[in-house]
Design a protein with these regions (language model features):
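A contiguous, surface-exposed recognition patch within enzymatic or periplasmic domains that forms
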Residues: 27-69, 97-100, 107, 111, ...
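Alpha-solenoid helical repeat scaffolds
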Residues: 503-507, 536-540, 570-575, 603-609, ...
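Extended, loop-rich substrate-binding clefts of extracytoplasmic carbohydrate-active enzymes
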Residues: 59-102, 148-207, 323-351
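Short Pro-Gly-centered flexible turn/kink motifs
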Residues: 97-102, 106-108, 171-173, 212, ...
Length: 688
């Protein structure tokens, strides 16, 4: 039996004629999982700039500088932040979609952005990915919540995707030979375009293929972004290879540098365990070079990813071997589950978007599978021989021409309507189709991407009423104000609406603020207050005041917002943040003391209270903060270790009756290293 399966898997290069061996089914998937919790009801407005241009090494050629930083500045709206999770895990069952043939078993979770959780090579029983044994959100994504493991699909904007912890649509499509193909798809709410991924696992294929399609439905250019993020196990003997001799590497202090491969800073950076700090590098390919990346162990075995030429970028990411990097690894999973990321993207780096022409459609195909190459060459000192041996091994099992042929063949499936629906995503695409139909506009979404009426839910209900009745329903300000909107077409609908109540003006102000029309936002929010004073509107005015540089006014408005209510934890956190930025520490300390017990227990309230306590010299009770495991520490955030050092400085200064000066600070950092529990410093090594 094993011999028959092996022969079926190795004979894939011969065109297949039967579809009987590929199956697609829904299966329960049970793992220890934290509750994702409620979304944050407060809108998080983007900054004033659309570009985020890093420092650039003068050695980087002009052609590679052109789009670095272009349209990469953070934004989240109309999505709300997903920051309500904890670290309490219990067994939970999710619906998974399993695509399987004789050679591979691929398991997807449509509830979490369509994440490919597992890819098992059946003849050997090997898991080809880093499969996270738990679901533990952490603060790394554009909307905060993110979890590690498997393969993630990221579009729209630099960072982990808006839907990485949200449902997407899933459907079964018939393949070129009648075999089942899994389609994942959604509507992007930030830049307003549809995207889809068709997963092909032909009978006898030892490779999983993903054919992506992005459609720009607009008569204008779109900044476009795509990166496929693949987690693979990290071990000392694992080497990441790509066909390049130089790379671009990002550093928080020096920006983007052009570096040699594989050795720089005295270490071979293709082995992630040789680096103490977190790092990445983006390979620079020669013209005409096939695009691929692989992570191979000491025996020359591992996973590779290859694609058609549109997907031009490849990246390696490692957490580093410092205490903070190791802490992050176990924080995201379990102590024994260290991983690295190999990635593939549309641009050369992740710090850039690229212009997508009006009305354009972009497609490409990626392949994922097991690879074996000569370990002596793969791990030899000659880097050129190492990557060329890997390149040749990939070409033997999956020729570049074959992938191009399959991409052309799969194109017919890309535009094919599904045979059956498997899972529903959000109702926003269905709402957009209704808006376009009501306004006599062309459908911006290909017909073969169904977004049925039943996907419309509570989030879309008030906006549907605005569209159909020219009126946004009234809403109790004691409850959360509901889903947000930033699409310009809805701004004009709100401006013409019959409804004249606080929520209509509040939403209109949100739209204007996100469009950087600060005066227009203020007018709308003042109109909202005239209709009915609410904490939601006062908070937004506080955000605007701080944006304009008036910290005192921002603090006062935040306090008014808290008094007006509803007194929810996210508002308390923002009020404390405003007081802290204004250095009104005594006021912040007293504010916490008056909070309801449930709000006082919020981890961010606790963290800000500790800051205020240290600054005001009230050190009693602060030490308990350093024994708490915080759930929402941000990637790159060092607030906990900063608090630790500040606490030790104040404590020693009081005991020894000395000032807190540079000499004391240096001593504290040498004599009082932070506990592992709170050390998330990714760029600190050797205690420095």
């Amino acid at each position: 039996m094993k011999l028959r399966v092996f022969l079926a898997c190795v004979s894939f290069l011969v065109p297949f004629v039967s579809s009987s061996a590929t199956t697609l089914r829904v299966e329960p998937y049970t793992i220890p999982a934290a509750d994702l919790g409620p979304e944050n009801p407060l809108p998080m407005f983007r900054g004033d700039k659309e570009d985020d241009v890093p420092k650039l090494d003068p050695a980087i050629p002009e052609a590679e500088r052109r789009y670095l930083g272009w349209r990469t500045a953070w934004r989240c709206l109309p999505h709300r932040m997903q920051d309500g999770y904890s670290r309490d895990k219990k067994p939970r069952t999710f619906d998974s979609l399993v695509l399987e043939n004789e050679c591979l078993r691929a398991t997807f979770l449509p509830q979490f952005g369509g994440r490919l959780m597992s890819l098992i090579q059946k003849p050997s029983g090997r898991e080809l990915l880093s499969r996270n044994p738990v679901f533990q959100p952490a603060n790394l994504a554009l909307r905060n919540a993110w979890f590690c493991g498997g393969i993630e699909w990221n579009t729209t904007l630099r960072g982990h995707h808006f839907l990485t912890c949200s449902p997407v649509f899933a459907a079964e499509v018939r393949g070129t030979e009648g075999e089942p193909v899994l389609r994942l798809y959604e509507w992007d709410r930030v830049r307003c375009f549809p995207w889809q991924i068709d997963f092909h696992l032909p009978p006898g294929s030892p490779f999983l293929f993903a054919r992506m399609r992005i459609v720009n439905p607009h008569a204008r250019e779109l900044p476009m972004y795509w990166w496929t993020t693949i987690a693979v196990p990290e071990r000392k003997d694992v080497r990441t290879l790509a066909p390049a001799t130089t790379a671009l590497s990002f550093n928080r202090d020096t920006g983007v540098s052009l570096v040699p491969l594989p050795i720089w800073n005295g270490r071979d950076q293709t082995y992630t365990t040789q680096s103490l700090s977190a790092y990445d590098f983006f390979s620079r390919f020669a013209d005409g070079q096939r695009r691929w990346i692989a992570a191979l162990d000491g025996e020359g075995r591992g996973l590779f990813e290859a694609s058609t030429d549109r997907l031009r970028g490849r990246k390696l990411w490692g957490w580093g071997m410092g205490q903070g990097g190791r802490r992050w690894q176990e924080f995201l999973s379990l102590p024994s589950e260290a991983y690295i990321e190999i990635q593939a993207g549309l641009a050369q780096t992740q710090s850039e978007s690229i212009p997508m022409p009006a009305r354009a459609t972009w497609c490409w195909t990626e392949a994922f599978g097991a690879l074996e190459a000569d370990p002596k060459l793969v791990h030899g000192k000659d880097w050129s021989s190492a990557w060329k041996a890997t390149d040749e091994a990939i070409e033997r099992i999956l020729p570049r021409a074959r992938v191009e042929q399959l991409d052309a063949k799969f194109a017919a499936v890309t535009t094919r309507a599904p045979a059956r629906s498997l899972k529903l995503g959000s109702g926003w695409a269905a709402l957009e189709r209704r808006r376009c139909a009501a306004q006599g506009l062309p459908d911006p979404i290909p017909a073969e991407l169904p977004f049925p009426r039943e996907s419309l839910g509570a989030d879309q209900k008030p906006w549907l009423a605005l569209l159909e009745k020219n009126e946004l329903p009234k809403h109790n300000p004691g409850e959360e104000p509901g889903a947000l909107m930033t699409q310009p077409e809805w701004q004009s609908l709100l401006e013409k609406a019959k409804s004249n109540h606080w929520l209509t003006w509040w939403h209109l102000g949100n739209l204007r603020m996100e469009a950087l029309d600060f005066d227009g936002a203020e007018k709308a929010w003042q109109a909202s207050l005239k209709c009915q004073p609410t904490g939601w509107t006062l908070r937004n005015l506080a955000v605007l005041a701080e944006r304009r540089g008036d910290k005192a006014k921002a603090c006062d408005l935040m306090r008014q917002a808290w008094q007006a209510g509803p007194q929810v934890a996210p508002l308390a956190v923002e009020c404390l943040q405003a007081l802290t930025r204004a250095e009104r520490y005594a006021e912040a300390y007293d504010f916490v003391a008056a909070l309801p017990k449930a709000v006082r227990a919020h981890e961010r309230v606790e963290l800000l209270w500790a800051k205020a306590a240290i600054e005001t010299g009230k050190l009693d009770g602060v030490e308990r903060v350093f024994k708490r495991e915080f759930a929402t520490i941000r990637e790159g955030e060092v607030s906990l270790t900063d608090l630790w050092f500040a606490f030790q400085e104040k404590r020693l200064a009081a005991i020894e009756k000395v000032p807190v000066d540079d000499k004391l600070r240096e001593r504290v950092r040498h004599d009082f290293p932070p506990p592992r529990l709170i050390d998330f410093r990714m760029y600190v090594t050797g205690g420095k």
